[in-house]
Amino acid sequence: MSGDVPQGSLCTTNTVSDLIEQLQYGLGEGPCVDAYLLDWPVLEPDLASPKSSRWPAFSPQAIDAGVRAVFGFPLQIGSVRLGALNLYRDQPGPLTDDQHADALVLADLVGQSVLLLQADAPPGALAAELETGADLHYTLHQASGMVSVQLGVSVAEALIRLRAYAFANERPLVDVAESVVARTLRFCAAGDEG
């Protein structure tokens, strides 16, 4: 993540966590997005609760994936925002005080680890140990640039259009991006043939 725009996941632990990260990145909403932007833990103990309406696109898809509770914790060292740690479970319920304290310690340790790994990287480059997860999103950045040119809009607007297309067509964002890069999907301005 950088600035005010989530940049994607660097690490997931299983297929469900990978799906949750793809949903957040693709939809632009979810616990990690909010934890990063708000710089505060975001705790949702029951995604299926009628009181849980903060993520109208993310929540139903996360529930379909078997996730019932999600918890996002910012990764920040001093004033440096690094990203967010996402925890989930398949049963609803809040974190206990001990679990919450452990998650805060874990987020701090992950943040320190990222800084240590990044310390030896050349300026402007990502540490080799962190590159694996970043590779998954290069295609999306390339597709955003292509759509930006196709529509004559900013890259940020192009990413919004890609996300909207993926959501409307019930396709993973990465699949849509791969189609754009492969030139099997082209975005056209209103009134253009494409």
Feature-to-residue mapping (PLM):
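Short hydrophobic beta-strand micro-motif common in sensory/regulatory domains
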Residues: 69-76
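Short hydrophobic/aromatic beta-strand element in the GNAT-like acyltransferase core
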Residues: 55, 59, 72, 84
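Signal-transducing coiled-coil/dimerization helices and immediately adjacent hinge/linker segments
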Residues: 119-194
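Short hydrophobic alpha-helical segments used for membrane anchoring or interfacial signaling
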Residues: 1-5
